[in-house]
Regions:
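Solvent-exposed aromatic/hydrophobic patches embedded in short alpha-helical segments
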Residues: 163-164, 258-264
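Membrane-interface aromatic/basic loop that binds lipid-linked glycans or pyrophosphate carriers
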Residues: 64, 114, 125, 271-341
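Residues within HEAT/ARM-like alpha-solenoid scaffolds
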Residues: 250-258
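Nucleotide-sugar donor-binding/catalytic module of glycosyltransferases
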Residues: 1-233, 341
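Catalytic core of nucleotide-sugar-dependent glycosyltransferases
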Residues: 204-213, 218-249, 262-268, 274-295
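Compositionally biased, low-structure terminal segments
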Residues: 34, 55, 108, 243, ...
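Solvent-exposed amphipathic alpha-helical surface segments
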Residues: 28, 32, 241-245, 298
Length: 341
């Protein structure tokens, strides 16, 4: 068995784009390349193929699988099925590892101890079920084109810079949802964290979320507004997963989080009133209305203390952005959503 499987969905980006990721693996130091494998799943027939000559030029095992068109989530799931590593991580083909000791750092953390709560008792365990890290995000100033970098310390919704133990994934049927193509990766850590307390935090970044002009989530300044319905969709799938696992507390928390997010970030956010985004708001409210009607019972069942904690956290983030504009109460908003046709 390999120590680590690096799982990469590939669409039509070409060798010049994916080369940066594969090169960043090839320069890794203090590791045995026999301990790793890279699994690339090509999503459909569109775009250039990766040649065998190109793949063979790297000093580690690369598997290249051509799959019927299915979207990024299905490719990530298929790559996992092909993999054999004790640990796995998903990388985008246009990203890269940040430095030459990234994999050494990951391997080191698989053996170092940490204290966790198991059945209410503090115990010391070696390794981890999940490793989450700070990762770097590369950005561009829209006016000057200047490059800047952000430390993503709160990016738990992203799959970037995360490593998972295979046994955890398999034993708990943790997976991406095939029909989710946008905001699809926010479900994985939510599923995993509901199944284990052996989660380790790495404050040292080893992954770089690179800027690419053609990236689907970078090319539009109104991306979140355009895709808010997809965020609700992926959360809907996650709630059903929690319910199937009898993790009803987690399901309730998911409902509460979307209720407050939609209230503060859609209803109370002044930019959603702009002429260019009114249509997005209309679609978001209709999708949320359906969501709320479906899960109203879970909202009502959730303890007020939990609601307050989640709501205050989301409200504080909006306040810090200077975008809070509470024109209606939460109750009035929910009543309108319940009656929306």
């Amino acid at each position: 068995m390999k120590k680590l499987s690096i799982l990469v969905p590939y669409y039509n980006e070409g060798e010049e784009v994916i080369r940066t990721l594969l090169d960043s693996i090839a320069i890794q130091q203090n590791i045995d390349f026999n301990d790793i494998e890279v699994i690339i799943c090509k999503d459909g027939d569109e775009g250039p193929e990766l040649t065998q000559e190109f793949l063979d030029s790297y000093p580690y095992e690369i598997q290249y699988h051509r799959e019927p068109k299915g979207g990024v989530s299905r490719m990530r799931n298929k790559a996992f099925e092909y993999s054999q590593g004790e640990y796995v991580m998903w990388c985008d083909d246009d990203d890269q590892f940040y430095h030459c000791l990234a994999l050494w750092l990951i391997f080191r953390e698989t053996n170092t101890p940490m204290q966790v709560q198991i059945n209410g008792v503090t115990q010391t365990v070696n390794g981890f079920d999940v490793l989450k890290s700070v990762f770097l995000e590369e950005g561009r100033n829209p006016e000057t084109g200047e490059t800047y970098f952000i430390d993503r310390k709160d990016g738990f919704q992203f799959v970037h810079g995360s490593v998972y133990k295979r046994k955890l994934i398999v034993d708990n049927d943790i997976h991406f949802f095939d029909d989710c193509y946008i905001h699809e990766d926010n479900v994985l850590f939510a599923e995993a964290s509901a199944c284990t307390t052996q989660i380790k935090w790495c404050p040292q970044p080893f992954y770089l979320w690179k800027w690419r002009d053609n990236s689907v989530c970078r090319r539009s300044p109104t991306y979140i507004k355009e895709t808010y319905t997809d965020l609700i969709k992926s959360t809907d799938r996650l709630i059903e997963w929690f319910k199937a696992k009898s993790k009803f507390d987690k399901a309730r928390e998911c409902v509460v989080r979307i209720v407050y997010d939609c209230y503060y970030n859609v209803m109370c956010h002044p930019t959603w009133e702009e002429i260019g985004t009114k249509e997005y708001r209309k679609k978001a409210e209709k999708r949320f209305s359906d969501f709320y009607k479906k899960y109203k019972d879970l909202w009502l069942e959730c303890p007020d203390q939990v609601k307050m904690q989640i709501g205050n956290g989301i409200r504080q983030m909006v306040v810090q952005m200077g975008m809070l504009q509470e024109k209606v109460t939460l109750d009035d908003f929910l009543n309108r959503m319940e009656n929306l046709k």
